[in-house]
Amino acid sequence: EGVGGTSLKGYVTTCYDTLVSLFGKPTYTDADPYAKVNCEWVLNVKYFEEEGMEDYDYDRELVTIYNWKDGHVPLNECQWHVGGKSYIADDLVNLIVGGNIKADYNANS
């Protein structure tokens, strides 16, 4: 699934190394200083809405985490853009980063 139909839903403040440790290597990088996006993760996040739901009772959300018009891949702590098709994307990313929750499996690593 591509990132078509996603748009900015919020922000997460963290550093590049934290994102790599949680989500693996970026899906996309571009060293061009004139590129709008130099670094992006494209993730299909599986989540459960309520406690006690069965393992097969879950939803997925397409999430993107990216820098915007920085001219380089930011390594220090900064405000990363969070994209998605709904505002759940922002909630999920901030929950994962804030709780330092590592995925059992990461297709990007």
Located regions from the model:
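Active-site or metal-binding loop neighborhoods of secreted/extracellular toxin and effector enzymes
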Residues: 94-109
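Amphipathic alpha-helical segments
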Residues: 8-31
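Intrinsically disordered, low-complexity Ser/Thr- and acidic-rich flexible linkers and loops
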Residues: 52-56
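Short beta-strand-to-loop capping motifs
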Residues: 12, 45, 82-84
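Short, structured protein-protein interaction patches enriched in aromatics and acidic/basic residues
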Residues: 34-48, 58-61
